[in-house]
Amino acid sequence: MIRETLEGERDMSAPIAKLTLIPESPTAREAPLHVVSPEEIAAHPSPFVSPAPTVTLLRDESTRHPFALAIAAAWTCYGTRPAKVENVLKLVSEPAPDGLSPEKAADRASRRDRALKLYADLFAAGHHTTLQHATFVFVLDNVSRLAIWSFFHAHPFYNSEQVSQRYREVSGNVMVTPDLPEPALSIYRAAIERSLEGYRRLTEILTPDFQRDYARIFPARAKAKGETAAKRMADAVQKRAQEVARYVLPLATPAHLYHTVNGLTLLRYYVLANQPDAPTEVRYVVNRMVEEVLALDPYFLGAPGYPLDLRMLGAGDALEARALADWRTNLAQTAEETEAFCQRFDAELGEWENSRLVSSNPDGERLMAEAVRTVIGATPGAMSDEDALAQVLDGARNPYLGHALFLAMNSKLMQTMNHVPFTFQKRISGAEDAQNQRHRGTLSSGPLLTAHLRREPDVIVPWAIARNPEARAEYDATIRAIWDAKNALLDQGVSPEWALYLLPNSHRVRFYESGTLLTYFWKWIKRLCFDAQREIFETALEDVAQVRAVFPIIGRYVDGPPCVMRSRSGATPICPEGERFCGIPVWRDYAFEELASRRVM
């Protein structure tokens, strides 16, 4: 999944080229082979007046010799025994031993040259599994939520642990701020300050509501005396309040995270970093990532004389940008055209607020049952469709469903769930989609944000704000202020790239998402938990309600949170959350139809 936004009305080639390591070309196929030096990568300054994003490679936790590892892996394919990385390093990095005959010295030199060339040959020929053995663990800091959403988490091949806006108060001491001319910079900074003011004010307004909610669920805790008990309740309530208040925070809010990728993914980052949405920031961060790896292994981008033919894409070369035929045409898109698209999309959702099931195989239950019977060599006479589905989905018959690990990916019987596909049409907030991206088996085709920008605020209203008139007034005023600032920047000719940083977390994103029963199964279980953020919980409810309607047998088994699944399988403890227990024994007398009404916070 590639998420993009287009550049500004004016010619943006200069600032983008400043961050592109090869001359831009009319097409990626025509791009000349360019040898990139570490000096080039390090030469590009930060595009921000705020503290620059930082990138640290954890060397002890990462692969130290990605080049040699790829060569050893390739040699292993044709060797009589596994090749050793240390043997590759001796051949490539160390001088020839003393006393070699001229013939042996020449043979060694030839083998060394072939090894150096093999890395580039593997890349060019598409034998890319050899590049996936190398793993790099990065610590990223001061990276915007926009860059993380639009690039670093917009694909399935990563792992991240990111600071939570739900559970960590946002101080606002550092907010990502581009180097804009005046008066645009003042408009931008004022909008940031207004969003932070709204965030703090909403946290304050919502706190009494959540105090009452918390006391309703945990009356003993609310009545407990002492400093420790009071702090426990205050901390829990504050987290709930700031979880909702964060919807007014802009995408300029920075984050720190652990981000782990393999060598192949990092090379893809390097080629595609100029994609729209946040190309300047992403290019800066990716350059730092590659710089860190090159300091560890100078051959990561190819050996001397045999560089990888990366053909890095310029800002206008991305497939999505070309599909729009002309960036200027898209950027001249009228407000009426944007409104027509959004209204049509929203109308198609019909009765559903967040998610509509638009495609599934009507024969899905029978097909999955046939797959189950095929795995174990049974006939329909020996095992009915309902029994076959229960063998996989019923916790009483499948002990894997009570295991702490999600074992379906490695279970032959549970892999039969792959044969039941779904596609949903979704309209959710950016805050929810940032959570949604973590479910990397349910892939979406995310929007070009610039093509979806509307003049009037296009946001969701969180449930806790909708129920409190004072909070709703503050929310609306904050959203209006930052939305007007976004419009003002665009009216002044500021690149949409920078205006996007002012979008609030509550901005709507519209897209299609697909997966299989296997990939949705764990997502639905986790997101139907009362500890899940409210909005993604409500989306999961809509997903499951529609699946239950089209697949009644499957639906009866995928309709509950972890505690329900574990109670059906006999696993203990029934709630796996420990001190994070929601306080409501959902599994008792469970009925999907009553799940939403039983949730308090």
Each model region followed by its residue ranges:
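A conserved ligand/cofactor-binding region detector
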Residues: 2-601
